């Protein structure tokens, strides 16, 4: 297991996959490395389900932190092509957190859930000794819809186009410059530009827009491991290859300056909010047009091929063993 971040594929295959409880016929897609959600068949309906830790970052302001935390959770089911619909959430709060602080967090969660049509159906909230920010709980999101509308995470097919929104290190850039503005060597204008990237660190609405616009075959939120990690995870899960042209990938303002200042590789740094999609070429323009109308920065960056592995500018890449942002966060904290 890695010292920081999610477990790797080898650890999962050795310790987790052999012990998944009872086998049930209604589990259509169970736990799989690099796959954002599980899938249940309930009668004639499909249920996408995903669980994530809840991270509350007080320097963001508690209401904004609540919205940010919820978006991270909902993204994992939004990439199923089904709109997020239900939420179970648990808070294990530090004793130092005041009632007013929690009320602000909850207002952020409520407002974002209401805007996205998500209903909170159950949960648990308490203060406990030993709990501390930012990791203060966990949440499970569900998306319920027609089975025919599900976009499987392993659905990429040879001949599909590969699309990317936002590009590398959007979350890393926005988060680190917001949390540690005085410790990063950027001028005021560049710092403000970089901090604005945090508002783009959610792919929920982009995923819903793309799914409604055209024949999307797979979607993935580029979280830990960044874009390189996301490319490898998608290709591996589908048993296909990706050929990527780096120059076509959009790069948002402030990203390169921030990553240069921190000495990190933007392509392997966490990029929540950057959506990787594979699309039937007949629908690529429709998907790009819909994303553009929503104000998203998106581009066709490559294609899906027969075979295995990912190449970027004709050079083979592997999934990063450690997210590039972790060391920077540790150094700045």
Language-model region placement:
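Active-site-proximal betaalpha loop/short-helix elements
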Residues: 96, 196-271
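Acidic, Ser/Thr/Pro-rich beta/coil linker or hinge segments at domain junctions
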Residues: 3, 291-333
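Helix N-cap motif at beta-to-alpha junctions
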Residues: 279-284
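Short, acidic (Asp/Glu-rich) active-site segment that either coordinates a divalent metal cofactor
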Residues: 152-208
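Glycine-rich anion-binding loops of enzyme active sites
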Residues: 58, 86-176
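Small-aliphatic-rich amphipathic alpha-helix that forms the alpha element of a beta-alpha
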Residues: 62-87, 107-115, 203-209, 229-233
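Extreme N-terminal cap/leader segments of soluble proteins
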Residues: 1-59, 110-113, 117-118, 329-333
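General beta-strand structural signal in soluble alpha/beta enzymes
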Residues: 29-32, 48-50, 120-124, 164-166, ...
